[in-house]
Structures are given as C-alpha cells and as structure tokens.
C-alpha cells in the first residue's frame, strides 16, 4: 500500500493542528513543528484533508473506543471519505476494517 505509486495519501489538517499544539507545549518530546510537517507533506506529494462540518458532526456518532479528540476526528474523516486510516494506535482498529494498524 505504501509503495504503490497509484495510491493517494492525505494528512488531516487536524493532525497538523495536533502537532502545533503538542510541539508548543513540549518541544523536547515533539521535535517537529507544524511548518516542518506541512513542508514534508507538500514535498512528499501528500494531500491535505481539511476538517469539514460533516467530519465534525460524524465524531458524535462514533463509539467510545478512544477518547482522544484528534484521533476520533481522524476516524470520522476516514469513514466519511471512504479512506483507509493508517495508524500505530492500538485503540483505533475497533472502529472498523478501514483502520489499518501499522
């Protein structure tokens, strides 16, 4: 999946926002800035997936497998857009087959 050049990859604007918040609070633990992440994504051909109203609304219908609001947004976006969500978070696969643990 990752090496297939036909696949299109997206990064949620919520992920950029999360990096910005966490880097500001703990730069020792999160050494990457939001600007660096955006630059990396653009240079790598990764598309931005903006948070839309319907994504925000979809969070309310998710089962409570995970309490992190950023991760819940990623799940809602992937589900609403019909995308696969690649994650290393063990709490996300219960949301469905579209969540791929990496």
Task: Identify what each model region corresponds to.
Residues 1-86, 93-98:
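PIN-domain endoribonuclease scaffold, especially VapC-family toxins
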């Amino acid at each position: 999946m990752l090496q297939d050049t036909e696949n299109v990859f997206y990064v949620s604007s919520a992920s950029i926002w999360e990096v910005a918040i966490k880097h500001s609070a703990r730069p020792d633990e999160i050494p990457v800035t939001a600007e660096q992440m955006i630059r990396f994504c653009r240079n790598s051909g990764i598309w931005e997936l903006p948070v839309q109203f319907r994504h925000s609304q979809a969070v309310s219908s998710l089962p409570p497998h995970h309490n992190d609001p950023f991760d819940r947004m990623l799940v809602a976006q992937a589900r609403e857009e019909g995308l696969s969500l690649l994650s290393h978070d063990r709490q996300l696969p219960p949301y469905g087959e579209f969540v791929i643990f990496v």
